[in-house]
A protein has these predicted regions:
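Asp-box/BNR beta-propeller blade signature and adjacent active/binding-site loops
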Residues: 11-408
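Sec-dependent signal peptide recognition
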Residues: 1-7
Length: 408
């Protein structure tokens, strides 16, 4: 009897492993899924830099159910001669695997080109066999008006902090002018971009999509040109897309989506503004428009985060909770937080990684993706950079995360 009780209350403390050996190459922005047969698939981008590196490719690896280690990396996607970045994996309710990623056509943030592939043949060894690949161009609703509303609100939201560094105002002005396809501005600009193409391009994925209560798939997209985010929707497995209105809130990017039982869609974002707090937006129409914007009382060092809803109904978030200006590298601590009220408060916090190595060594643990597998375990894949780089995989259960009084 005591043995049974012990099993019922057993706690799985964090365990971890490297997906591949540490190496000098840049390995970043991991995404992870569980396949219908119980394997784990992870994807990331690999190369020597970011948008200026035309050798960047999307790599992947597989951990077969019951295996002790990950497979050797394989190529998931590659547009030769273009930098491929920000892969996002997702398995939909029909059991199809999806991959989104971007290529920088002219090595600029204005020319990020969003692509999408789907596969029903991905359970064997090696890379998925893609049934089809498509390109996604956006037509953001009311973009000039959104940018004007954003500009009108920055003083009220940020006060003098908004002009604490010139980059905030410069990015805002650039986004406003690009939203209006200002031909004079474009003629004077020294980078290759043409008018409305920036509105159609420049939007990137980072966090996994969700399936809305109405059955549509929704993915958060963001732009470093407009310094904001929007939602993309598909009801046919990614063959056709529609897009909501961008958020009129400066600096909320890389949105991680979750939907409450009452239908409210919540987006948690990286902070590209001056406050260095986790940003939040709420929508009453499933991401078509966004009405409420506020900050969590959790620091964010301009770094990505991830959210998922657990089978218990509780929400889990993986994030860096430093501000990046306190003498430590902002991404040198990674934490898991638990919400028991659908993301309104986050009262449980556990540290997953913590390095006090001097900032000049740039240790970081960042860009996480979190999922829960069918056995109840919580899995996190993230960039792991003590000195060289790899992708790290960590797993634990909700009981371990819940078994803490407040923040550590």
């Amino acid at each position: 009897m005591n043995f049974v009780i012990a099993l019922l209350f057993a706690v799985t403390a964090p365990q971890s492993e490297l997906v591949m050996l540490l190496e000098a190459s840049h390995n970043h922005s991991a995404s992870i899924v569980e396949t219908p047969e119980g394997d784990l698939l992870v994807a990331w981008f690999h190369g020597q830099g970011e948008k200026g590196d035309d050798t960047l490719i999307i790599q992947g690896a597989r951990k077969t159910k019951g295996a002790e280690s990950w497979s050797a990396p394989f190529v998931m996607a590659d547009n030769p001669g273009l930098p491929d970045q920000n892969p996002v994996l997702y398995v939909d309710r029909a059991g199809a695997l999806h991959l989104w990623w971007i290529s920088a056509l002219a090595n600029t943030r204005e020319t990020y080109f969003l692509q999408h592939g789907a596969s029903t043949d991905f359970e064997g060894d090696g890379a998925p066999v893609w049934n089809w690949n498509g390109f996604i161009t956006q037509s953001p609703q009311n973009l000039p008006d959104v940018m004007d509303r954003m500009a009108a609100g920055v003083e009220k939201k940020f006060g003098a902090d908004f002009d604490s560094e010139p980059k905030y105002r410069e990015r805002l002005v650039h986004g406003q002018r690009m939203a209006r396809f200002d031909e004079t501005y474009i003629d004077d600009w020294d980078e290759p971009v043409l008018g409305r193409l920036t509105g159609m391009l420049s939007w990137m994925p980072r966090c996994q999509p969700i399936t809305l209560r109405d059955g549509r798939l929704a993915i958060g997209l963001y732009s470093d040109v407009y310094m904001t985010s929007l939602t993309g929707f598909t009801a046919d497995g990614g063959k056709t897309w529609s897009f909501g209105e961008p958020m009129a809130d400066y600096g909320l990017i890389q949105p991680a989506l979750a939907q409450r039982k009452d239908g409210t869609l919540v987006a948690y974002g990286r902070d590209k503004g001056p406050r260095k707090r986790i940003r939040v937006a709420e929508s009453d129409d499933a991401g078509q428009t966004w009405k409420r914007f506020y900050d969590l009382p959790v620091e964010n060092p301009d770094s990505s985060l991830s959210v998922t809803i657990l089978s218990s109904g509780n929400w889990v978030m993986i994030c860096n909770d430093l501000n990046g200006v306190d003498g430590r590298h902002g991404r040198s601590r990674l934490v898991a937080m638990l919400s028991e009220d659908e993301g309104r408060t986050w009262k449980k916090r556990r540290v997953l990684e913590d390095s006090t190595t001097p900032p000049e060594y740039h240790p970081h643990f960042a860009y996480p993706t979190v999922i829960q597998t069918r056995d109840g375990l919580i899995h996190v894949a993230y960039t792991y950079t003590p000195l060289e780089e790899s992708i790290k995989h960590m797993w634990f259960d909700e009981a371990w995360l819940r078994d803490v009084d407040g923040s550590e």
